[in-house]
Swiss-Prot record:
<feature type="modified residue" description="4-hydroxyproline">
    <location>
        <position position="55"/>
    </location>
</feature>
<dbReference type="Pfam" id="PF02950">
    <property type="entry name" value="Conotoxin"/>
</dbReference>
<keyword id="KW-0108">Calcium channel impairing toxin</keyword>
<feature type="propeptide">
    <location>
        <begin position="23"/>
        <end position="45"/>
    </location>
</feature>
<dbReference type="GO" id="GO:0008200">
    <property type="term" value="F:ion channel inhibitor activity"/>
</dbReference>
<keyword id="KW-0964">Secreted</keyword>
<dbReference type="GO" id="GO:0090729">
    <property type="term" value="F:toxin activity"/>
</dbReference>
<comment type="similarity">
    <text>Belongs to the conotoxin O1 superfamily.</text>
</comment>
<dbReference type="GO" id="GO:0005576">
    <property type="term" value="C:extracellular region"/>
</dbReference>
<feature type="modified residue" description="4-hydroxyproline">
    <location>
        <position position="49"/>
    </location>
</feature>
<keyword id="KW-0379">Hydroxylation</keyword>
<keyword id="KW-1218">Voltage-gated calcium channel impairing toxin</keyword>
<keyword id="KW-0800">Toxin</keyword>
<feature type="disulfide bond">
    <location>
        <begin position="60"/>
        <end position="71"/>
    </location>
</feature>
<keyword id="KW-0872">Ion channel impairing toxin</keyword>
<dbReference type="GO" id="GO:0005246">
    <property type="term" value="F:calcium channel regulator activity"/>
</dbReference>
<feature type="disulfide bond">
    <location>
        <begin position="46"/>
        <end position="61"/>
    </location>
</feature>
């Protein structure tokens, strides 16, 4: 009888912890590394593909073509 009560209480506590954790994690990403790179790319201003660029200024989102001096993505 005591063991049954302990198991029921443990299951209820674990279920409550799962529900609380699920509510807190809404809108966040599962992997922290992906979240940090996403935040970095959203917070930096970069030029869209086809915009003029300089290969040394690193202002394109991906890369700058040194021959055409245009961003490509």
């Amino acid at each position: 009888m005591k063991l049954t009560c302990v198991v029921i209480v443990a299951v209820l506590l674990l279920t409550a912890c799962q529900l609380i954790t699920a509510d807190d994690s809404r809108g966040t990403q599962k992997h922290r590394a992906l979240g940090s790179t996403t935040e970095l790319s959203l917070s930096t201003r970069c030029k869209s593909p086809g915009s003029s660029c300089s290969p040394t200024s690193y202002n394109c989102c991906r890369s700058c073509n040194p021959y055409t001096k245009r961003c490509y993505g």
